Structures are given as structure tokens and as C-alpha cells.
């Protein structure tokens, strides 16, 4: 995975197809996944991570090699790895959390406790 994580053919969709092709091959024993990304789309990150988890469920080892940087979604897609290798100068860290606040004004008939 090189660059910002995006959806679409040039982004996560293409990477997912490559991972799927590897884990659907019965001769595959391991997937070495190179990450050089500051992150990006949470949906794209989740798609790639899910595909790596599918490979792990098939007893395929997942090995991540981090390049110049692996942050946010780049770290998140690395979490299924059995092994993670990084360069001494790799900048890595911070899995961000998305938050969508709920609108409870429209909830009728609910009993609310006050704190």
C-alpha cells in the first residue's frame, strides 16, 4: 500500500483484489504487505484489514513491512499481522477514532437517567 488510502480502483479496491487473489491461491503460505502510507479513508482501511483477516483465517501468515511512514489507517491495516517490520526511520503510530454523534432529540418514549 503506497500513499494515501482511498477507495476505488487505484486505492483499496485494487489492493483488496491482490490480497484476495493471494489468499484464494491454495499454494500461498504467507502474504508480505508493504505499508508506506499516512492513512486516509477509514472504509478503505477497513476493507484491506478485513481481507488480511480473511487470509489469517485460512492459516496464511501475514507479514507487514513498513516504509517511510505508516500512520492512522496505515497502522490499522497492519494490526492483523503476525509480524511487523519497520525501518529505523519509519514514522508510525496513531490509529484515529471516527465519531458520529447521535441525535437523540428524535427519540420518543425513552426514559433518560440524569447524571
Which functions belong to the PLM regions below?
Residues 1-60, 69-115:
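Small-residue-centered hinge/linker elements
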Amino acid at each position: 500500500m503506497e500513499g494515501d488510502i482511498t477507495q476505488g480502483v487505484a486505492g483499496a479496491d485494487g489492493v483488496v483484489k491482490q490480497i484476495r487473489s493471494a489468499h484464494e491461491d491454495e499454494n500461498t503460505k504467507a502474504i508480505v504487505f508493504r505499508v508506506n502510507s499516512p492513512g486516509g479513508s477509514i472504509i478503505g482501511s477497513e476493507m484491506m484489514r478485513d481481507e488480511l483477516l480473511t487470509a489469517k483465517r485460512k492459516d496464511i501468515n501475514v507479514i507487514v513491512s513498513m516504509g517511510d511512514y505508516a500512520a492512522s489507517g496505515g497502522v490499522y491495516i497492519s494490526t492483523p499481522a503476525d509480524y511487523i517490520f519497520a525501518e529505523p526511520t519509519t514514522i508510525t503510530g496513531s490509529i484515529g477514532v471516527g465519531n458520529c454523534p447521535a441525535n437523540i432529540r428524535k427519540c420518543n418514549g425513552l426514559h433518560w437517567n440524569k447524571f
